[in-house]
Amino acid sequence: MSLDNLTIASRYSKALFELAVEKDQTEAFLAELKQLRQVFVDNPQLAEVLSGSLLPVDQKQTTLSTLTDHASEYIKNFIQMLYDYGRMSNLVGIVDAFEARFDESRKIVHAEVTSAVKLSDEQADAIAKAFAKRVGANQVVLSRKVDEAIIGGVIVKSNNQTFDGSVALQLTNLRRALINN
């Protein structure tokens, strides 16, 4: 019975996160894992090469050693285990799941803010602080998007929730109220 990618990512990230907490190394593990993830994102064929039969085992091991050259022993062992169990293609998903666990443990929320004009850093910081207070987060990491169609105000999306404070929505609601009355 094969496991789906989400289950694999969840199990491996949970085990690694528990080790990171035990060793008080969550930030260090995350930093190392993010670097490795970026290598695999930038080189999508790398996981296939390490999983496939194109390269001899000794060349794969050399590649793994090069990849983890500056990593801690824990991360080296983790990557070696993924290789040994044929899970290199799951590395990006595992790191994503590890980062989600890290964020959850620190009450860090990622959100996208849409505005009609480009927000200044001060405006974005104010929105992040207000949103953090509203959702009970310690920190909000905002990505910004401009959409002139909202006319004014902002729309903040996070974790399948949308907080719409746009002028476009207010006009739509006003129009509906006028039509219904």
Curated annotation (Swiss-Prot):
SUPFAM superfamilies: N-terminal domain of the delta subunit of the F1F0-ATP synthase. F-type ATPases have 2 components, F(1) - the catalytic core - and F(0) - the membrane proton channel. F(1) has five subunits: alpha(3), beta(3), gamma(1), delta(1), epsilon(1). F(0) has three main subunits: a(1), b(2) and c(10-14). The alpha and beta chains form an alternating ring which encloses part of the gamma chain. F(1) is attached to F(0) by a central stalk formed by the gamma and epsilon chains, while a peripheral stalk is formed by the delta and b chains. Its main location: membrane. F(1)F(0) ATP synthase produces ATP from ADP in the presence of a proton or sodium gradient. F-type ATPases consist of two structural domains, F(1) containing the extramembraneous catalytic core and F(0) containing the membrane proton channel, linked together by a central stalk and a peripheral stalk. During catalysis, ATP synthesis in the catalytic domain of F(1) is coupled via a rotary mechanism of the central stalk subunits to proton translocation. This protein is part of the stalk that links CF(0) to CF(1). It either transmits conformational changes from CF(0) to CF(1) or is implicated in proton conduction. It is a peripheral membrane protein. It holds the Pfam family OSCP. One of its GO terms (cellular component) is plasma membrane. It comes from Lactiplantibacillus plantarum (strain ATCC BAA-793 / NCIMB 8826 / WCFS1). This is ATP synthase subunit delta. It is found in: Cell membrane. It comes from the Bacteria. Belongs to the ATPase delta chain family. Keywords: ATP synthesis, Cell membrane, CF(1), Hydrogen ion transport, Ion transport, Membrane, Transport. The lineage of its organism: Bacteria, Bacillati, Bacillota, Bacilli, Lactobacillales. One of its GO terms (molecular function) is proton-transporting ATP synthase activity, rotational mechanism. Gene3D superfamilies: N-terminal domain of the delta subunit of the F1F0-ATP synthase. NCBIfam families: ATP_synt_delta (TIGR01145), PRK05758.2-1 (NF004401).
